[in-house]
């Protein structure tokens, strides 16, 4: 194992050297990972929004965001500040409790998914053995918030949008889970750390995308549908439902839906990187590179550099997936609701189930 840096011990040692007591350092450490996680997730969303607007503008031969900061990089932040100062309007005949809780129930489970995303062997907030099941479980809670928002708005368009979101999630959650289970069978583990380590031995040739090409394609389609991205944005189709479940929302509650959508897209891209593209592993095994350069893997400088390389590789693969999803948005038309459900139940479900059975059969045959 190359990366043996213990972030918690390093943090406690650093503050002890500054003269702080051990108890104070531990108390300071407890909320720090969650706080950093939220900050990184929000910054990641701002970057994704800016990239989408610039790439979309390039596809349509426009300039895109230009005035707020260099190349318009501060435009998403300006939009967020604008929404923060907007008036919060609640429908007079709506269900106030459901209307208020809906956006929070959508966003919180998606943020929890970041707890098990690894950026390195020890660069993970919570390395639990059932990490993949945890992600599938918490991601299935978000559609309940959409349904609550649609019902609590007391608006027919909002309610229809909430129903569509629930039906869409049910249709694509099962194929997504089956694709992930195929990867878990190959890796003999449900831990995200173990899944990446299984792929890192032979470099790019060991990545799961070569062993699970059908599962990778099915995973991408199901992930885009779960994120309600075009061509699967039926719950908020403007031409049919005004804005779907978001119709009655204003201010930061309205902004929470957009944050949830982009955070979910970023999480899906991170898991695509971890499950199929080797996560933090380089295309060439790091041990081979160290031997060629005559470097010692136990040196702290080498470990720090390898940690930063791992983070960079994870983000590079993640943003490659995001780039493909943005291009898909502008190259494919929106499907009808019957086509959406047919694709999920009649095509993706049998394909992902067959892929799982084939993977299990090969594992049994190789025992």
From Swiss-Prot:
Task: Kindly give the membrane topology term recorded for this protein.
Answer: Multi-pass membrane protein
**What species is given as this protein's source?**
Mesostigma viride (Green alga)
TM ranges: 29-49, 96-116, 128-148, 176-196, 204-224, 266-286, 304-324, 347-367
Gene Ontology molecular function, alphabetical:
NADH dehydrogenase activity; oxidoreductase activity, acting on NAD(P)H, quinone or similar compound as acceptor; quinone binding
Primary gene name: ndhA
Major place of residence? plastid
Lineage runs:
Eukaryota, Viridiplantae, Streptophyta, Mesostigmatophyceae, Mesostigmatales
Which catalytic reaction applies to this protein?
a plastoquinone + NADH + (n+1) H(+)(in) = a plastoquinol + NAD(+) + n H(+)(out); a plastoquinone + NADPH + (n+1) H(+)(in) = a plastoquinol + NADP(+) + n H(+)(out)
Instruction: Spell out the family assignment given in the record's similarity comment.
Output: Belongs to the complex I subunit 1 family.
The name this protein carries in UniProt is NAD(P)H-quinone oxidoreductase subunit 1, chloroplastic
* Annotated localization: Plastid, Chloroplast thylakoid membrane
HAMAP family from the entry? Answer: NDH1_NuoH
Keyword check for Acetylation:
no
| Matching InterPro entries | NADH_UbQ_OxRdtase_su1/FPO, NADH_UbQ_OxRdtase_su1_CS
Keywords from UniProt, A to Z, are: Chloroplast, Membrane, NAD, NADP, Plastid, Plastoquinone, Quinone, Thylakoid, Translocase, Transmembrane, Transmembrane helix
Quote the cellular component terms of the Gene Ontology held in the record: chloroplast thylakoid membrane
Q: What is annotated about its quaternary structure and interactions?
A: NDH is composed of at least 16 different subunits, 5 of which are encoded in the nucleus.
